[in-house]
Every structure is written in C-alpha cells, then in structure tokens.
A protein has these predicted regions:
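C-terminal accessory extensions appended to soluble enzyme cores
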Residues: 125-196
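Conserved AdoMet/S-adenosylmethionine-binding subsite of the radical SAM
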Residues: 1-156
C-alpha cells in the first residue's frame, strides 16, 4: 500500500487497483486511509476484484496462490462497507461447457448490493494458454476476424466465441440494475461520473 500511496502523492491522479487477492484488516485500514487522502485531493480510488468462477475456479487459477472466490466476495462486501465502490471483474468468461454461466450469475447475485458495476469480457487464447488449460484449439469455436498479435511477441491470440454467455450475464446484470461493461475504462468512467 505504501508504494501506491507514494505514486498517488507524486502523480495526484485517480487510483485504480485490480486484485485477485484480499486485504487483511491492517491493509484494509491502510486502503481506507489512502482512499480518504485520494478523495480529499479531489480524486477517486477504485478497487476491482477479479473473480470468474466459484466451483470451477481451479480451471483458470491455482487455488493455492489466490484467495477463494467466497473470500473475494466477502472482500467486495468489506470494500463497500468502508465506502469504496468496488467493481466486479468477471473475466475472462469461458464457454458454458468449461465454466457454467450459472456460476458467473451466482457471482453477480452475491455481489449485487455491493458492486458499482461489472466488467465482463471473453477469453483470448493462444497455444500457451490452451496448454495451461489442458485444452486444444479444436475445443472452442472462435469469433471471426478477432485475432491479433500480442505486443512485439509473435503470439497470435484468438477470441473464443462466448457471445451467448456474455448475453446471459448482461441479462442478469440488467435484471439486478447493475451496469455491465466489456472493458475497464468505460467502467472506471462510469464510477467516476457516478460520484460527481
């Protein structure tokens, strides 16, 4: 938290933290103090918590290295309780056969009273990612003309077709009155404008 504080004091800009981990009580207190300092300077602090599955989490994350989904849900509630406007980062979304959409809908329901919005988008894969997932290219259907090279690395990324899954999540968010965005920047702008 100290590095974040130093960066804020140097640049005097909004602060956006994305995490899959959770903060202990001391860190949460420090976050609250920093949030007040940021707000006093006329800026805003946002915290996005990344969760994209409940029971199937081990498909995309090593459960020994990050907080459990239920603990992250509790963390979102803690952030809301101290006056922050947490964002649920529900991405990447996998095809229903890999991670059921119902799990993602449960995440939205469980955080609906505490998040300001949801950011949810599809899954981009390359050979390395497929290998880590224990899958092969033929396991998925892909969006047409949605390929790109990542940075300077010759690494072709293809986007898995999850339009049905995203539509279901958008419907769930709409039914609960929660805005859903595909990218972080519109979500950040939404929360900042919500406050002004």
């Amino acid at each position: 938290m100290e590095l974040t504080r130093q960066l804020f004091r140097k640049y005097k800009t909004n602060v956006f933290i994305i995490t899959r981990t959770v903060f202990d009580k001391k860190q949460l207190r420090e976050l609250d103090e920093l949030s007040k300092e940021v707000n006093d300077a006329g800026k805003m602090m946002l915290v996005a918590v990344s969760i994209n599955a409940i029971d199937s989490i081990s498909i995309c994350e090593n459960p020994d290295l990050v907080a459990t989904p239920m603990r992250r849900i509790s963390f979102i509630k803690e952030l809301s309780a101290i006056g922050l406007h947490p964002i649920l980062m529900l991405r990447p979304v996998f095809p229903n056969e890999v991670i059921p959409v119902a799990e993602c809908e449960k995440l939205i329901e469980a955080t609906s009273n505490d998040v300001s919005c949801v950011v949810s988008s599809g899954l981009g894969v390359n050979d390395s990612i497929l290998s880590r997932l224990g899958m092969k290219e033929s396991d998925f259907s892909y969006k047409e003309n949605q390929e790109y090279l990542q940075g300077a690395i010759e690494c072709e990324i293809k986007f898995v077709n999850v339009e049905k899954e995203l539509a279901a999540l958008h419907k769930k968010c709409t039914s609960l009155g929660i805005p859903m965005f595909e990218h972080s920047m519109p979500a950040i702008n939404y929360v900042i404008n919500m406050e002004t």
